[in-house]
A protein has these predicted regions:
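His/Asp/Glu-enriched, well-ordered alpha-helical/loop segment
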Residues: 4-6, 43-47, 58-145
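Short low-complexity, flexible loop/linker segments enriched in glycine and/or proline
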Residues: 52-56, 89-92, 160-162
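Active-site core of metal-dependent hydrolases
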Residues: 1-59
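Short Asp/Glu-rich motifs
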Residues: 49-50, 85-86, 156, 182
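C-terminal cap of metal-dependent C-N hydrolases
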Residues: 136-183
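Short, glycine-/Ser/Thr-/acidic-enriched flexible segments
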Residues: 14-15, 42-45, 80-81, 149-150, ...
Length: 183
């Protein structure tokens, strides 16, 4: 009781196999609880259902449905080059790209705010509160991406231009330049 936002359910892959009627009832209770959800879509799509005969389960939780129902859901990766997901590399934009595909979140509204799944929603899951965001008095921890929108950041897998931690610049990147020669 009263734990609410201090509780996070990770993976919740079984939810992808529940029928809609059950999920409708479950979502009401989950929303009232105020808990957070973290999905690791690259790991889930790899691990879940791999030994099923056809049709195979997708094995990923209902990210889009949780989000649209007003619950806090974020994406992550908990396997970095290990037996559970050997291609894990910690690149959160790659996870987001895969997650948007896997979770059928290619609609206009989803793409306009997709970075929330790996930024704002993640900060809410971690209960960072006043320790997160850009405002006077808050720690200056941020990465500036070489993109002008969430959509472009994911579509182009934008690289960080500047990384700042505690107000100190840790890294800057000069944009890549490609020159074509006449054939």
């Amino acid at each position: 009781r009263g734990m609410g936002s201090r509780v996070t359910a990770s993976h919740t892959t079984a939810m992808g196999s529940y029928d809609n009627a059950y999920c409708f009832k479950l979502f009401r209770l989950l929303k009232m609880s105020g808990i957070n959800f973290v999905s690791c879509p690259t790991e889930s799509i790899h691990l879940q259902g791999r030994f099923d005969s056809f049709p195979k389960r997708r094995g990923v939780t209902r990210v889009a449905e949780l989000d649209r129902a007003g619950m806090n859901v974020c994406l992550g990766q908990d396997s970095i080059k290990d037996p559970w997901y050997p291609l894990g590399n910690g690149n959160i934009l790659r996870v987001l790209d895969a997650g948007l595909h896997i979770c059928h979140m290619m609609g206009f509204e989803d793409l306009q705010r997709c970075l929330d799944l790996v930024t704002d929603n993640s900060a809410r899951t971690l209960n960072l509160g006043e320790g997160y965001g850009i405002a006077v008095g808050r720690p200056a921890n941020l990465v500036i991406l070489d993109a002008d929108s969430d959509y472009e950041a994911v579509r182009r897998q934008a690289k960080g231009r500047v990384s700042i931690r505690g107000g100190k610049v840790l890294m800057t990147r000069v944009p890549e330049r490609v020159e074509f020669t006449a054939a």
